[in-house]
Amino acid sequence: MFAPLNTKTEYSFLDSVVKVDDYLETAHRLGYQTVGICDVGNLHAAFRFVRKAQKFNLQPIISIELNFEWRGLPIAFSFIAKDTEGYKNLLRISTLHNYGRRQFSDIQNHLSGIALIIPETYGSLSELTELSSVADEAFIGIDQLTDKGAKFNLPTLPFPAIRYLNFADNEILAILHAVRDGVSFDESLTISSNELLQRPEAYETYFLKYFPQALKNLSALTAKIAYQFDEKLELPRFDKKRQAVEHLREEATLGLSARLEEKNLLTEVSSVNLQDLSVYQERLEKELSVIHQMGFDDYFLIVADLLRYAREQDIYCGMGRGSAAGSLVAYVLGITQVDPVQHNLFFERFLNPERVAMPDIDIDMPDDRRAELLAYMKNRYGSDHVAQIVTFSTLGKRQALRDVGKAFGMTEAELSNLTRMLVRRFGTLADEYENNQRFKAEVLKNGKLKRIYEVARRIEGMPRQTSTHASGVVLSEESLVNYVSLKPSEDLALTQYEAPDVEAIGLLKIDFLGLRNLTIISRLRDLVKRRQKIDIDPLKINLEDEDTLALFRAGNTMGIFQFENPQMRRFLRNLAPSKFDDIVDATSIFRPGPSQFIPQFVARRHGKEIVPTVDDSISEILKPTYGIMIYQEQIMQVAQAFAGFSLGKADLLRRAISKKKGSELEKLREDFLDSASHNGHSKEKAEEIYDLIERFANYGFNRSHGFAYGALAFQIAYFKAHFPDEFYEIQLRDRKREVMILDALENGFEIEKPSINLMKIGDFVKNKKIRLGLAHVQGISRDLAKWIVENQPYKDLADFVEKLPNNFHKKENILPLIQIGAFDYADSNRGKLAYNLADHANLLNYYSDDIFMASSGGGFAYHEAEDYSETEKYDFEKNLLGIGVTPHPLQNLARRFEGNFTPLAQLVKNRRMTILVEINYIRTHRTKTGQTMAFLTVSDSRENFDVTLFPEIYRQFSGELEQGKFYLISGKVTERNDELQLVTDRISPALETDRKLWLNLRDDKYNQKISQILREFPGSHQVILHYSNLKKTIQTKIYVEESEILQKRLEGYVIAGIYK
């Protein structure tokens, strides 16, 4: 029977549209019994293909196509693995090829268990016969286009290439080839249909008729192919001279003594201490027993050794994270810095003897020192025993559109116009087409664009090239090439299998996570030590520090890991955390799912809502979180306390619910109800508690992880509370600079005016004053910045230009410095300096080498010119520095309209409020009914914000809207996608004007009603009240728009009202 052995999958990058799952499903449906893959240049899909084929009861056959030079000829050989030995030789051959070994003689010793396929182009070469003696078998691969009268010097084998599964995909393949080759797609070219997977009968009929022996050869070959994969975990030995179980026990015992000494449990003997001591010792014994029983002794020694090396090199790796923080062994070995006994964290959540799985210890490290730890692993275990893991860059929606559009001849301008319409929140092109009306309208403009969209949608998500997994590293006892093909990479070799496959074949995977926040802590520590002569050990920071807790209570958490979101900051202000556990709760509940319980959580914390008692047996478990199961550990405790489950079994229940494992879940549910009954609970109560567990198990967060990451956030916040200068200087290097500068300003910092004599290369912060750095000035190269700092000071602009080397003697190198005010100390008229620079009086030419250098010596005579306006100065600074140093025009308006608007940072959901803002961007949108509405992006010089104008309001105010202008905008504050926005009903320009609204009243009888009406019409005109009976006039702080509707609303309450 025919078998498609030469199927190229999508991992033959841009050379096939065949997805592995689709291929197996189609082959099964068409009646195949045997299927193969033969990707070009790699084995990325091999292991996954074998496992999935077996689920379809299909016989899988693995092969690979590689170019090797044989007798001076570059030949695209295909290598079929006939058995397990052949599969391992495929791994070796592929690895050798990846490392540049491209001579056939380089692989001749690795052809056992291999069937060699030679392209029919070389089938008549007499020397081919010698290849049959090198490999187990050698064949000439033929297909339907092979000359039926051809004579070959080796046996033949049906080997047609398969690159698509549906006939319509042949065009997609042709376009993919155009993308791959960087050429335009030519529709006039005939598209071949012989690479379509057909029914087996079609191939059999053809080959029986023309090449019957080839079909027999295929049947004989496939009949003897089978693989046996040993998927048993093969952990590398940490120390081949010692038994790992003894070594681990010794290290853990010593580590426990050291940890207990830190807690004074060994030095201060008392009955309480002895009781605590026994808790630690018993738990350590229990954990060591489970670790050995599951075969992970070496694993713990390997990870502990790596963390020990990190400490020796002063690489701060944080507190540890994830469920590993629940292990006492991990704590005493220094893998984590969280005491699981003290904080009631569970080992079973990490390593469960009732659930056989690899322990998952993720190692966090500063991202700028990750390479050092990779190098240590390479040197410690050998370069052929350690590798990073491959991942794939796939065709995203933007790239897919660009690639296909280019193949169809679109210009760069057209491509940019099309891709600019894409919106990030819509994940795929199909989502864009469904939800982005502007994009859909563009696509439907003509048939060509519609076709480009359809093709791009089909190839979206396909792998385009390899990349390196952000964190995964694998280790093996034997050489890795016995398990997986490798390719060279920057730090370590790179596996050809992705992470799930690497773990499935029994390799140890450790995640080396480079965290920017650990880099920030390390840099903060270094800067504080250098400046303040204080060495802050992050692990010794008091997690109950009151100044730091006050920072969280105020929601002053910009720059703090996991606490920067505006909604999180608002939540913190409502929560008012008073202890570190509150911080852990906050980061754990503020997630999709459990965040729905935040209002109850806050209300119960402050006594505004009663905490329900579901059952006395679990009330103490839920008491710390006010009756809400935030944590997975609580779910396990409830199952243990209520139904008598072991913690291991409780963890199985939690996992079964969260992963929705049907049959397993049903059995565990019955076990829970039965066990609860044996514990004396009624069926009704047991079902109530089970339903409660089921509800929260979908949302529950790992408290071990929450504690470790809460501690990391607290450590960063400690520096913000106690060393704010150093905090902001480091954050300005590593974060969104504009955001952090604004945060510093809100915390009482000032920005120093730029001065060419005082600026450094980078930003500098001291005594709550920020000196912006030259490296951040747009248009100033690092080399120029370095020269400026090395040659300070300068008397004035002329002195600076005179000293400037010829290679920097350009207007574009100097004008930005004038425009940010770097020479204001000598002459504050920036307009005059810019005027004289080059365009008119040619200050640059005056100080060039060949002009005027022998002048009379009186110096350059400046021509007078008008200075920039304050708004122009602000705009130049904003564009060139990222922030305006000159007061923003809105600040003057804010003083004028104080009390008439609410700052963006203080908006409250579901309230009608007025904001004073600048319009940055106006986007119109046509509704399904054909009406036009608008979305505005506005800012108050500190924060950006979204404003929505529905059609009726847009019609009313569209003529007044202009980007770059200032407005008072009123409406209802709502929430969308977890972000606040304003749905407006009134817009009024914010103007500096002397025109006022004068209201004449008899007395103050209607003051409250008048004030209420006036505040519905915010605008630029100050309200003046004259009381005729009281003979007094009051200048109010209320400003209103000029409006006939307002005047009509005031009728009956005032004698007269006039604008003048």
From Swiss-Prot:
Any single GO BP term: DNA replication
EC number: 2.7.7.7
CDD domains: DnaE_OBF (cd04485), PHP_PolIIIA (cd07431)
UniProt-recorded Gene Ontology molecular function terms: 3'-5' exonuclease activity; DNA-directed DNA polymerase activity; nucleic acid binding
Family (UniProt): Belongs to the DNA polymerase type-C family. DnaE subfamily.
Assembly, per entry: DNA polymerase III contains a core (composed of alpha, epsilon and theta chains) that associates with a tau subunit. This core dimerizes to form the PolIII' complex. PolIII' associates with the gamma complex (composed of gamma, delta, delta', psi and chi chains) and with the beta chain to form the complete DNA polymerase III complex.
Record-given protein name: DNA polymerase III subunit alpha
Organism: Lactococcus lactis subsp. lactis (strain IL1403) (Streptococcus lactis)
